[in-house]
Amino acid sequence: MEMVDIASPTGSEKDMAAYLERRMSRAGLKTTLQEVSAGRPNAVGTLHGTGGGRNLLFTGHMDTSYDGDEEFLTGEGFKAKAVFRDGWIWGLGASNMKSGLACALVALEAIAEEGISLPGDITLAGVVGEIEKAPIEEFQGEYFAGYGTGSRYLITHGITADYAILAEPTSLQVSNANMGCIWARISTGGTMAHSAYGKNPGHVNAIEEIHHIQTALLDWAPGYSERHAFMGERPSVTIAAVQGGLRWRLSRNPFEASLYVDVRTVPGQKADDVKRELRAVLQRVAGERNMPEAELIFYVNDPPTLLDPELPIIKTMRTAHEEVTGTASEPVIRLPAADSTHFNRYDIPCAVYGPGGFNHSDAGTWMHAAGEHVSVENMLTAARVYLVAALKICSQRPA
């Protein structure tokens, strides 16, 4: 609950990093605050082993999905103030993913307190800038520097491991795969003219042209999702924002307009495959409308990722889960973005497993509408699974 009480929106993770570093240092870990950018440190702590064993990295992001003071978000699950009720913790970051970080921290504290000696090192890293945000147009600065900013810095500035466990919310399921994401901007031009003459022959309304493109994208999206079904899930296409015209001067014909599309991708897809599909839609609309092809740019390309389920990290996590819970965990694919993409790309095979993701009965079936919350019982389960997995992995010696 202490972590939830520390506000840590993207770009303002410093206080959370300081808290995590203090806890790790108190437990006897060798700690450092790794400055990613001014005022944005990753918090890293290592419990060194005797040497010669496999090294394990627990990791998770410290930034939260929201600031906690948005007027359009009400309820205790959207605020940086923890509330405990009926065995559940409610508050911003409770599920995504301070609960996972807390469970990993408790597992390391237990190993350190018991004086357990392992051949391998165990590291815990709380990272900045994971939330799905990206700079575009006037939206610039640290607040928009998400999508793996901290994890990429962590990996490329000296933190290594044989395997990683990412404590993202998975409802206590072992995940070996993650969808990727592309954010695209599609823009059209129009005629600068007074609105009173907007219907003159030859005048083009950019918003009307965007409307035709939007209709075509909505027609294309279901087929895209079906063609790329993977591990029982289908990647979504979401028209997430639209912009055009002069809101302060409606007496002017819209001479520019854009729509912004979130396209989820699955392992095996490449960004240029998606670009070709989108351009085919735009070219078809241009031909039907006898207009120039709309401009298409990508400003996020977060690739999908997939690990062989037979890799030791996945098998060990499944075994640990079964030993703790008595139930099997078949590998699943996660739909939202996650930093496992970056660890896998840098040859640190990363399993994803965390206590968040379950919904309290008060929340119905959709946490994003009710606010974040997590079961303490599920946190205890995750901490035990992390402990068992760490003991197994860090006791192994490479062949």
Language-model features, listed with the residues they occupy:
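Metal-dependent amide/peptide-bond hydrolase catalytic core
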Residues: R185-A399
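Residue-level signal for inorganic ion chemistry
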Residues: M3, A7, E168, I210, ...
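Short glycine/proline-enriched loop/turn "hinge" motifs that connect secondary-structure elements
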Residues: L73, I116, S175-C181, L250-P254, ...
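Short beta-strand segments
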Residues: T59-H61, A125-V127, I165-E168, S187, ...
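Short, conserved micro-motifs enriched in small and acidic residues
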Residues: I89-A102, G115, V204-I207, H373-L380
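Acidic/histidine-rich catalytic neighborhood of metal-dependent amide-processing enzymes
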Residues: M97-M179, P398
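Acidic/His- and Gly-rich active-site-bordering loop/insert found
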Residues: M1-A94, E113-L118, G357
